[in-house]
Amino acid sequence: MLFLVLLSGLIAAIFSLLDVWYFVRGALVVLKARIQPVVKDLLKEHCYGGIVLPHDLDFLFHMNNSRYLREADFARFAHFTRSGLFQAVRYLGAGMVMAGSTIRYRRSLRLLETFEIRTRLLCWDDKAFYVEQRFVAPKDDFVCAVLLSRQHVIGNSPDKVVQSMCKRKVESPEYPEEVAHWIKYNDASSQQLRAESAVTNSAKDE
């Protein structure tokens, strides 16, 4: 009896302190992607289906803003696994983290509404991959939201990752106009924050 009480307490503590279902679902998404056919075209669009459940809702009974980002995570996990991108990053002893994202909401997703997340690798530079993800309503093919993200490669470079995948050097596609503008915005923001940090540190030294 005592063992069951302690076990229940431990499980309750784990669920209280960790987002357990995020890790469980993420692992299941990757496992499923591993047994699905390999997507050899790195630039091919990948579709990942979803449905709005009660725990996804906000006070207005729409899918809440944070859930879009969460669902986009799972769609990227599936795409990067099936395309071999995750495997290539690990093979090179590198890592990959989200370095920035921008999302634009165009139409709400409601309870029990189905949607597709269409993920595309757009381009890359010497530090990061740039990925677009569209939340599309299958009933009318309307883009309900669009997410642009920067996936920063740590310990290596996107060029080397792609070369490892394709067994040859591959040039990045030309940057779409909106991506080029977004990169400039991020660079300007970084410079501004560095300048503010330098001023703050200088003031502390005085």
From Swiss-Prot:
Glycans are attached at residue 64. Residues 1-26 form the signal peptide. SUPFAM superfamilies: Thioesterase/thiol ester dehydrase-isomerase (SSF54637). InterPro entries: HotDog_dom_sf (IPR029069), THEM6_lcsJ_thioesterase (IPR051490). Pfam families: 4HBT_2. One of its GO terms (cellular component) is extracellular region. It is found in: Secreted. Its main location: secreted. The keyword Glycoprotein applies. Keywords: Glycoprotein, Secreted, Signal. Belongs to the THEM6 family. This is Protein THEM6. It comes from Xenopus tropicalis. The gene is them6.
